[in-house]
Amino acid sequence: MNLHLVDSDGHLEAEKKLTEYLTSIVAPSVSPSRGSATADGDYGNGALEAVGLNYHVVGVFGGQSSGKSTLLNHLFGTHFQMLDETVRRGQTTKGAFMALANTALAGLEASDVAVVAPRLAPSAADRSSRLNHAVAAAVTNNTTGGAPPTGSPLLVLDFEGTDGLERGEDQCFERQLSLFGLSIVDTLIINMWAVDVGRFNAANLSLLRTIFEVNLQLFSHSNYEAEEKPTLLVVLRDFTEDDPLPSLTTVRKSFDTIWESITRPAQFEDTSIDALFHLKYYVMPHYRLQKEEFMASVETLRRWFGDSRCSDYLFSYHSMFRGVPLDGLPAYLTNCWAAIRTSKDLDIPTQREMLAQHRCKEAKEQELMTYRDFARGYEDRLLRGEMLLRLSEVLDEEMETRLTAFYRQTKLYSSAVVGQYANELETELVDATMQVLNRLSKAIATEVLSNVESRVLNSVEESLRQLLKSAQTLPFSAGEDSSTTEPAEAHDADEDAARLLGAQRMDSAACQRLVRGFWRTLSIQVKEVVAEVAAMPPRAHLYGRYAVLIVQDPTTRLNVLNIVTDAFFQKVKSRLVSMANSACDTMHSGFERSLTYNSDGTVRFFATTRGLQKAVPAAVQAGLVVLGSLFYFRLKLVSAAVSDDDDLDTGATAALPQSRSARRVRHNRCHIVFDDNDAEAAFYLSYSTLDTAPKYPCDVPVPTLDCDREEVGVAADCVLLSQQATVRAYELYKQKCDFTTQLQLRAAEAGNQRLPAWVIPALFILGWNELLYVLTSPALLVLVVVICAVFFRQFFVSQWHAFEETGPASVVIPVRTVVHALSALVRSLLGDGQGSCPERAARNGSDVVASGEREMAHVKVTSTHADPAPSNTTVPTAQATMRHRTTHKLD
């Protein structure tokens, strides 16, 4: 059962209710023979009198939401309300709560102790401080009669956390609770996170300064006794290091620093902090990560409070060291709180700091208001569509004027306080400046985006086309030799195509290199567009009517570049997300492109079903490589401070002024890069065969979207396809590929006009005399050759294509080489070429090398279908018979 001792508004519970509460929690632990029942049957007061001084009070201070209530509940078996992190983080304990420790817990068992005679009562009336007069007023009859009780109650106080959003900068209530706690407790627990050791604000060292100051106020009287000092127990929570000594040494140095910085009475001028406190330290393991070790440390710490035989027992006296009997505790608390609430000097650390803070805050608000009024005028002019040249320079000059005025008004105050408020003023001034500059920059960025948006989106399509060209010529790592087995009949073509397709094994490492090449190419092409936007002098076709303004305002120019870069990144990501949502259609489009066009961009025709069957595996492989490129977004928008690619906007930042707004804009500069970390480098699809779905990288952990992680890994918001979506896309893709392949096979079979194999030998046998006559007559031979070249050219070409598709590679490749050489020689002799054969061959070879290096670096492939050649020809639309798409959006 808990008592709300002090509510959030600073109201203490009534004295009568305090008495009733203490009676209700203490009476069960007191033997009836120990209590002195009155004539009115008031057994409760007798129970409190029976306890006398034989009790202890423990309190806890610390930052808000730092686990104070959790620690007390585990340590003393109390039931204070704890923070529910699933709902929100905020204030849980408001004011102060009191509860009785569960003495049935291991380490807190009741033990027989002798009650020490009250030592402080005779001198209480002689104390001079107002708080100690309250003590004397409360302790009027502090002698306890009868034998001591069998148990020593332990009262636990849970105080409101400091540094909370609800209180804001108001530290008055915090200091009042600190003074109230020190006037009550025997042991004060300071709850501190181990990671905050060495910090001032995060470790709540301002609270410790308050505790030291108010404790000096309590004991600045002439009758001060050296034994009259509480125990300060510093508990370091979530400690994960092996050696606590460095952290404890740092904590002690922080205490000494605070102690030396406060103003002390003459009697404590040359003393250390140990003159006012018994300092103790304890470290506890992580509450969540080391739950068992944490509970073990709780049991150990509990013995410090309950086992008098423990070497670290905290209560040097077996009785309440303030000398206040339990029946006088309600009056003592009431008088102490009344004295604290009327003490106005508790509102501030010192009068001098208060005055400096008040004056600096007033000057800061005045200058900030003046600047905002100034900036609002320019913002209104921008809303009216005015063209403001050198706007950033005007705003920077006004910022300097406001900061100079602030320093002039506060030059006589504490430099530390002035510096703090000056930094706050500068930050808020720059924020107001950026608000105006962003309004102008967004208008310019809109103009730029309207002119280059299509180029950014085309870079995605161009990178995908280059990926398909490289994937189309990527050889398989292993597979059956399809050239040794030919279908016996035309109706077995579908079965043979399926067998050939499943027999191919993909080169997984080469496919992953192609995926990396796709993202590297995409990042380079987007950077080229960004570089054009950042080029000086600015391009008129990009900036339009803002070109003159951009030349005269470098800060605005770089701010526009920041906005444009971010917009490019978002547009590219949006486009890739859209492609991933319809991954099956995107893959099938790549399959159709690879099946319909050669690697050089020319249209591909199949004279036989065998040629079509040989081209299908490479086309299917190209679509699977596209899937590997779509399932994770690999571009990043990184700060220019951490990016190695600083050559992109050297011209944009070279002439940038060193003003405050320019520094902010430069700090916000980002680059679009492709840079996989260690986790992302392993987050690629693994390929085996064409009839097996790519293996999803399940061994690489992917955090949830709401998980706050500082370590570098796979970004959850960049995963475009889950494992289920990847498998589903593969299955739909295979179905569409099979359907398209069947249609093409049937079309090839229907258009097959090849002569039967016995026709050619029969013609030679039956027409041997005529053939011999033609061969022996030069004029007739020339006439026949001309007629065949004119009227039967297409027939011979189709037969040659059929031979290329069906003939053995050992024969096709040499014959093709000879034919190409003869064709080049004839064209050079006829003078219709673009130079000599060696020159053109060298030029074509260099173009091929340059194209390969530029499009897909780090991927070495050999053509298995056609000779690669450079081409800038726009790819035509695929044939209508190959358009069999449906809109499937994958979850």
Curated annotation (Swiss-Prot):
Ranges of biased composition (kind: Polar residues): 863-880
Question: What superkingdom does the record give?
Answer: Eukaryota
Q: Which residues lie on this side of the membrane: Cytoplasmic?
A: 1-754, 800-891
Task: Provide an example Pfam family for this protein.
Answer: RHD3_GTPase
EC number(s) of the enzyme? Answer: 3.6.5.-
The entry lists its GO molecular-function terms as: GTP binding; GTPase activity
Q: Where is the composition biased (Basic residues)?
A: 882-891
What membrane topology term does the record carry?
Answer: Multi-pass membrane protein
Location in the cell: Endoplasmic reticulum membrane
**Biological process GO terms, please?**
endoplasmic reticulum membrane fusion
GB1/RHD3-type G domain: residues covered: 52-318
What family, per the record?
Answer: Belongs to the TRAFAC class dynamin-like GTPase superfamily. GB1/RHD3 GTPase family. RHD3 subfamily.
What role does it play?
A: Probable GTP-binding protein that may be involved in cell development.
Protein's recorded name: Protein SEY1 homolog
Please report the organism this UniProt entry assigns to the protein: Leishmania braziliensis
Q: What is the lineage of its organism?
A: Eukaryota, Discoba, Euglenozoa, Kinetoplastea, Metakinetoplastina
